[in-house]
Amino acid sequence: MPIQEAEKSYKPHVIEEKVQSFWEERDIYERVKELREEGPRYSFLDGPPYCSGRIHLGTAWNKIMKDSYLRFKSMRGFNVRRQPGWDTHGLPIEHKVEGILGVRSKKDIEDKIGIEEFVRKCREFAMENKAVMTSQFQRLGVWMDWDDPYVTFDPAYMESCWWTLKRAHEKDLLLRDLRVITWCPRCETALALAEIDYHEKEDPSIYVKFPVSGDTYILVWTTTPWTLPANMAVAVHPDFDYAHTRLDGETYIMAEALVEKVLGEEAEIIKTVRGSELEGLTYRHPLDEEVPCHRDMEHRVILGDHVTLTEGTGCVHTAPGHGPEDFEIGKEYGLPVFCPVDEAGVFTEDAGKYRGLFVKDADSDIIDDLRSKNLLLRAETISHRYGFCWRCKTPIIYLATEQWFLKITEIKDKMLSELDRVQWIPSWAGESRFRNWIENARDWTISRQRYWGIPIPIWVCEDCDSIHVVGSIGELRELAVEGQLEGDFIHRPHVDRIILECGRCGGRMKRTPDVLDVWIDSGVAGWAALHYPREKELFSEWFPYDFITEGHDQTRGWFYSQLGCGVIALDETPYRRVLMHGFTLDEEGRKMSKSLGNVVEPEDVIEKYGADVLRFYLLWANKPWEDLKFVWDELKNVNKMFNILWNVYVFATTYMSLDRFQPGDHELEDLHFRDEDRWIISRVNSVALKVTEALDNLHFHRATREIHDFIVEDLSRWYIRLIRSRTWIERDDPDKLAAYHSLYTALKTLIVTLSPIAPHVCEDIYQNLVRGAEPDSPESIHMLDWMVSEDAVDGKLEAEMDIVREIIEACARARDTARYKLRWPVREIVVVSEDDKVLEAAESLKGVIAEQANAKSIRTSTEFPDMRIIAKPNPATLGPKLRQDMPPVMRKLEEADGAEVKAALESEGSFRVDLDGRIIVLEPDDIIFETELPENIVNAQFEGGSVFVDTELTPEIMSEAMARELVRRIQDMRKDLDLDVEARIEVSVKCSPEFRELTEPQREFVENEVRASHLSFDYTELEYTKEWKISDENLIISIKPSDKV
């Protein structure tokens, strides 16, 4: 079907629905994949979003970046792997399901619901959200293998995870140990460091007196009073000076450097000792009456290099059951790991008086008890950064528990060396942020005391405590002596019922009841998505991955877990290139949250502007690695760009459809291409080259901004303006066809370049414009190869056109100064510059300047020849020298030719004034030169020169000016009648004899411009009549459609 005239306005929802239906009905995505099957492989791994709700703006941004880049790679000929992933296990989903089922604790889950039912509900919830989120991503136009995703609850995927744990065990990197770890009392499970969010929190800040003897105390500061029942020691730094300080009849032992800050100027230092001298000093536990077990324990001062002087007293409360550093130093000194707190954060019987209290609720009771015993020096509050559970937002606590760990500390060096093989965008993401995280990494707590997750494949013998790590479903079936799997279902509680026989003692082996940290789930995605080691061929084809991208929080999340798991399982990094992107924030830079009421949903944006506008905006707004502040007004600007693009498309199809333009019908050498035609072809290819480079480097902001500026500035505001009059030529004129061909080529190249970013509108334009003009072209724009031609780029022409556009803008400013309308022609414009490139550009593109500046003649020069130079005396230098001779010298200079005076100074270095035979010699500093333009000349400057515009209104100029004013009024009347572009009209004008005489010579010009078959000044009223005023002339214009051609 030939090119059809496009809809007059841009309707994104209509376009996007039509295009997505077209893709689905014609199976375009699968056919694009088939088309690229023989191309070089490009392997991409999708960071799996949680199936815990609907997508948000950040999730949309993430998938849009991925989709745009992968569409680009596909059009570059690559066979792209774009399998989506789904993270389906863990606390994010468990919490949502708990809310649905109305349960509040693990006890409720086990007693009221049952693990089997709870796990089933979690799976259903994940599946439902996966379907919803898939639909949302598809609405954004994201092309991925939605029918073949990797899902972390898939048995084949879980099996790869089991294999990874077996590899860790084989390498002696799997460890069960008692350690102090971060713990969520609400979820009753261990947390990894990556699962902790930090926020400001108010806590008690208390100074506690630990009794030594008599009225002497060790002064200790803490913000966690609830950990005092577990205190086993006080740590001091061996090299700090510690003071015995008297205040109010009591002696306090604390760091000398902090005495004045804590106790004030009134405190008196009695003596000072080194911290090392305090080692072994015993004290009585301040809560030994409330927590009786402490009466049977010895408490003493120990030494630790972790003690600082930045805050507190330099004497650090040490509870090995509640702090990682406390635990480590406690091991050195053989301190008991006393932890009187259960999994729910409630004090046990060992906590004495505080038994049954939630730890944070006990803070006030502990403070009151200390105060009543005169063991509290001061109680305040402090605001500080504190860790919260990433899902339920409960403040974390530290507990000593037995957990399973991966020995990351033993593979840290290998991880760092593998990191050097990865390209990071931006580079500092890997070189500083991620490297620092790895360098400070601790062993990874991988066990979770929950239900919906990959069961840890570790069976422990009930008799001899030996372990066996199962690496596959087949291995489990083979080793099982009791219980059996239901198909390949290896979730809890089914897998818990499988009993193995101990290979060492023949005893019964039961699975450890924990599930894996969900970061293990996603950390093994690189091979689990390929079902390795079960399916080795896929793995060899696609691993390792060429590209991944996620937000900057994943430096301690997915980027880290993949690298750690990759080194453990395969001795290498699973990815080669990483783009770390930012977060989406509101206009003020705040995190979006329902509580702030500042959440922008992707659907809201799509409803208002469509998916393509959202896609373009998110890539255009800022550098991808920076946080994105979502600004509705900026979105409007992007929407405006799409409307401008559509208007250009409407312009093109309106005239091309009228003339049944087919690019293949004409030999290029037969067409009359102008400089502006060659320029637009060069510009669009320059833009395509820059976009190619930008997308190759994942600089989406540069790519989109190049496209935006081209559409708005080059294509719409400039090229369409340059060729508009040529499209009105009625015959198959070579000049008009050259404009058509150039505009067609520019639009085709543009939509190919834009299509990875805004696939819907580009597909829609392609189907009409390109498929209409070239019926044998591929069925979808996304089947085209990437279009860019370096040979078509003419850098010199582009530079010259840039100069000419500045010249034309300067001409417009000069007209504004003279209040001289642009529709009125001027007699002459002189372009003045000392830069040869400027003059060369003006000469080369003189025709463009003449047409766009509406000038009869264009001249170029290094100076304006008609400028009058006026010489005046400089009072600052001549006043003191001339005194009474000043007035006659002034008159002589005024009478002299300023240009001659200036020439004399330049050639001879001075100018002589004859005062009745007396010669006065004037130096260059003695004379000031001013310039004066001739009447009717106005000038304006531009970078590189000036323009001088002659605004004299000759009869010929006035005749043409009035004719153009008449054309404008008739065009407005055509619009009022909503006439088609090609419609002919008859025009009758009632005016004064003077106006008729002035415009009669321009009759043919007016008729051509307004498509009039006849223009009559013998007035007859036609169908549509309107009164107008042009300058001081009152007119009546009447028009009607004409049947004449």
UniProtKB/Swiss-Prot annotation:
Transmembrane segments: none annotated. Keywords: Aminoacyl-tRNA synthetase, ATP-binding, Cytoplasm, Ligase, Metal-binding, Nucleotide-binding, Protein biosynthesis, Zinc. Its main location: cytoplasm. It is an enzyme of class 6 (ligase). A motif ('KMSKS' region) lies at residues 591-595. Its EC number is 6.1.1.5. GO terms for biological process: isoleucyl-tRNA aminoacylation. GO terms for cellular component: cytoplasm. It comes from the Archaea. A motif ('HIGH' region) lies at residues 49-59. Its cofactor is Zn(2+). It is found in: Cytoplasm. It catalyses: tRNA(Ile) + L-isoleucine + ATP = L-isoleucyl-tRNA(Ile) + AMP + diphosphate. ATP binds at K594. GO terms for molecular function: aminoacyl-tRNA deacylase activity; ATP binding; isoleucine-tRNA ligase activity; tRNA binding; zinc ion binding. Catalyzes the attachment of isoleucine to tRNA(Ile). As IleRS can inadvertently accommodate and process structurally similar amino acids such as valine, to avoid such errors it has two additional distinct tRNA(Ile)-dependent editing activities. One activity is designated as 'pretransfer' editing and involves the hydrolysis of activated Val-AMP. The other activity is designated 'posttransfer' editing and involves deacylation of mischarged Val-tRNA(Ile). Belongs to the class-I aminoacyl-tRNA synthetase family. IleS type 2 subfamily. IleRS has two distinct active sites: one for aminoacylation and one for editing. The misactivated valine is translocated from the active site to the editing site, which sterically excludes the correctly activated isoleucine. The single editing site contains two valyl binding pockets, one specific for each substrate (Val-AMP or Val-tRNA(Ile)). Monomer. This is Isoleucine--tRNA ligase. It comes from Methanothermobacter marburgensis (strain ATCC BAA-927 / DSM 2133 / JCM 14651 / NBRC 100331 / OCM 82 / Marburg).
